[in-house]
Amino acid sequence: TIPIVDEFDTSGAYTHGDGIRLTYASFIPETKQNKTPLIIWLHGGGEGGTDPTIPLIANKAYNYASPEIQKYFEGAAVLVPQTPTRWMHGVSSNYTRGQEDDIYHKALMGLIQNFVKNNPSIDHDRIYLGGCSNGGYMTLKLLIENPDYFAAGYISSLAYHNEFVTESQLLRLKNIPIWFVHAQDDAVTEADKTATPLFKRLKQLGNNNVYYSLFDHVIDISNQYGGKNYLYNGHWSWVYLHANQVFYD
């Protein structure tokens, strides 16, 4: 067991009006603030199911409740929703990269709004949404559909293909702070088809709060798993994100 995981409530469940049921884990900090920010993490394609401890542990999303991260916010609530399948489950296909709607974004938005409603200490002006791969797709989808709801987005190994982001959708993202994290050798969600061109379009549009950390490779910076300079799969750029090793110079 990982002690910090035990600080999460993993019994959360939400059923939307369309019948879709989503599970979730959550963390509410002890803080002196009257209002606390909310950090939302959306898992990747391999962490679906009905056990929210899976997305908590698989990509170390529990780190958002760690003292290292919490100190930046003087306490922040954490919400980790889970889909029974994958966020990119299309309405007419098993997999959408943005060419059609997915079946989950409305239910997920309902879950988030319901959670915020039931936790009145959450600051509506400081709701931060992020995710990796499948969850990166869904992060971008929710930012497009709800541009005035979230304070910022942070996306690792984006799976939403740039070619399917229309000009009108891009305009909705113009004023949203977004940080993309990707690896150039990501063979699953290729940077040149996803984050790189989208970042350039947002900069050209005039979004002055869009940032991009593009790594050559994903290396075991902890030296605990593969050893010094061990190369991870290039898709795993969230390793840097959850180790708090993504900086803007």
Describe the residue ranges of each PLM region:
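Gly/Ser-rich "nucleophile elbow"/oxyanion-hole loop immediately N-terminal to the catalytic nucleophile
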Residues: 30-31, 90-133
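Active-site machinery of serine-nucleophile hydrolases
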Residues: 38, 45-106
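Short beta-strand/loop motif that positions the catalytic acidic residue
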Residues: 173, 179-182
